[in-house]
UniProtKB/Swiss-Prot annotation:
It comes from Homo sapiens. ATP binds at G70, P71, P72, G73, T74, G75, K76, T77. Binding to MYC is dependent on a Myc domain essential for oncogenic activity. Its main location: nucleus. The lineage of its organism: Eukaryota, Metazoa, Chordata, Craniata, Vertebrata. This is RuvB-like 1.
């Protein structure tokens, strides 16, 4: 007897360095639990982020900036991702790194503006009137051609639609008759017609005719329930950048130039301020009419000290514009020279006039106990068994070196344990691996000792 194991077809996600972060881990009153949702410690920073999430949800935070400042390996990126998780998928979250703005094709400010627009969502509500049912009759009515001659033109189309509740006869425009012909609609088909645009969609043949033929390449659909005339509310989520791109490069065009343009490699073009202004006007009109609502999202700029003085000056204006998202900066620098200047030093590599506009959240170094908890969570995420002794030793290594280094030792130590035929990582495996791989501090120490042997 042969038994086959059926493998799951669901996508296996690669474990990234922040896969374990599921949220900020706050209770109902907004206080941080010691360890929850994959985050450990940093209670003050997490509570501050919780307040920001509440402000974003109540739409009172637009155009403000927050700076996550702290030493490397204290969880700044993890906090930003936790904010994104808390906000959910409906609020746009656009992550970028400070060095992304340097491009040979377009200006630095253009890259910043593009990401600003990516972080602002627009929720468009549309009520569509739809006629839906099975076609019972389809009669085009002809009249004499007004241009003279013997030809005849179609003046209107009479169509009968039937649902489970009743039937309706509609008198339609001749332009819809062309759509009906394109869709090859005939009696017995289930169709729907949009009242606003006159678009016709054939859904399939009604399943009462399913027994008519043995061989047929038709898709049979049930008779629609409810009335023939229905109202459907459709909600679409788009970002302002999507609207910019759609209008910057219009599709179509039958002439040879536009055909060539589509075939050639599209060069990244800049979207002009004029076009953005026009789109803003249309968006504002929609908001005034109540068709759409603006959803200010989050723009996360990691390694913000990589931006130069021109970008920072541009950020002043962008943050104070009428349509601006919430901007979260992250930096692990202390006092350093602002990029693009000769000798101006500033905290976190950000000019003082911009620092004045941001709210700063500090992240502190982890205690050995918190390091152990984080390593334990990482081991669970990666599906690794680890003994208590090995965990304590990794915690000590993390305190002496960095958290990242001790987390990186997990996978090689697990491999070594498997080679030795053990199920879980023991202390000796961790010791052996830490001797094989150097951390940054010990590597720098060796460099200092043997400086004369290396090339200058």
């Amino acid at each position: 007897m042969k038994i086959e194991e059926v493998k799951s077809t669901t996508k296996t996600q690669r474990i990234a360095s922040h896969s374990h972060v599921k949220g900020l881990g706050l209770d109902e009153s907004g206080l941080a639990k010691q360890a929850a949702s994959g985050l450990v410690g940093q209670e003050n920073a997490r509570e501050a982020c919780g307040v920001i999430v509440e402000l974003i949800k109540s739409k009172k935070m637009a155009g403000r900036a927050v700076l996550l400042a702290g030493p490397p390996g204290t969880g700044k990126t993890a906090l930003a991702l936790a904010i994104a998780q808390e906000l959910g998928s409906k609020v746009p979250f656009c992550p970028m790194v400070g060095s992304e703005v340097y491009s040979t094709e377009i200006k630095k400010t253009e890259v910043l503006m593009e990401n600003f627009r990516r972080a602002i969502g627009l929720r468009i509500k549309e009520t569509k009137e739809v006629y839906e049912g099975e076609v019972t009759e389809l009669t085009p009515c002809e009249t004499e051609n007004p241009m003279g001659g013997y030809g005849k033109t179609i003046s209107h189309v009479i169509i009968g639609l039937k649902t489970a509740k009743g039937t309706k006869q509609l008198k339609l425009d001749p332009s819809i008759f062309e759509s009906l012909q394109k869709e090859r609609v005939e009696a017995g088909d289930v169709i729907y017609i949009e009242a606003n645009s006159g678009a016709v969609k054939r859904q399939g043949r009604c399943d009462t005719y399913a027994t008519e033929f043995d061989l047929e390449a038709e898709e049979y659909v049930p008779l629609p329930k409810g009335d023939v005339h229905k109202k459907k509310e459709i909600i679409q989520d788009v970002t302002l950048h999507d609207l910019d791109v759609a209008n910057a490069r219009p599709q179509g065009g039958q002439d040879i130039l536009s055909m060539m343009g589509q075939l050639m490699k599209p060069k990244k073009t800049e979207i002009t301020d004029k076009l953005r202004g026009e789109i803003n006007k249309v968006v504002n009109k929609y908001i005034d009419q109540g068709i759409a609502e603006l959803v200010p999202g989050v723009l996360f700029v990691d390694e913000v000290h990589m931006l130069d003085i021109e970008c920072f000056t541009y950020l002043h204006r962008a943050l104070e514009s009428s349509i601006a998202p919430i901007v979260i900066f992250a930096s692990n620098r202390g006092n350093c020279v602002i990029r693009g200047t000769e000798d101006i030093t500033s905290p976190h590599g950000i000019p003082l006039d911009l620092l004045d506009r941001v709210m700063i959240i500090r992240t502190m170094l982890y205690t050995p106990q918190e390091m152990k908890q984080i390593i334990k969570i990482r081991a669970q995420t990666e599906g690794i068994n680890i003994s208590e002794e090995a965990l304590n030793h990794l915690g000590e290594i993390g305190t002496k070196t960095t958290l990242r280094y001790s987390v990186q030792l997990l996978t090689p130590a697990n491999l070594l344990a498997k080679i030795n035929g053990k199920d879980s990582i023991e202390k000796e495996h961790v010791e052996e691996i830490s001797e094989l791989f150097y951390d940054a501090k010990s590597s720098a120490k060796i460099l200092a000792d043997q400086q004369d042997k290396y090339m200058k």
